[in-house]
Amino acid sequence: MNEKVKRILTGVKKYLIESFGDKIRQVILYGSYARGDYNRDSDIDILIVVSDDANPIEVEEFLSDLLFEILLNENELCSVRAIPEKLFKKYNSPFLLNVKEEGVMV
């Protein structure tokens, strides 16, 4: 993972924690940047695990302005999904298995 992506991820996590506090349980990078096989067209895939009393859709929508700024200022597209902690721990869909196996904690 390159330094620009590390800086972006650190900023996203800080922004989330400042806004949602302990409702943010984990921020995980997954996909090509986590695997190290990214190219210039790759997006930055981020999974946010939230407490069960948080609204994942609200977290995703909250980030939309920041993600747009990242696109404009850094020329990096970020794709964000949020999921309640209970579902993240309980289910092993192909997507979640991939994140659990290849994901990198931020």
Segments the model singles out, each with a brief description of its role:
Residues D45-V49:
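Short beta-strand->loop micro-motif that forms the acidic, two-metal-ion catalytic signature
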Residues M1-R25, R35-G36, R40, S51-V106:
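Catalytic core of pol beta-like nucleotidyltransferases
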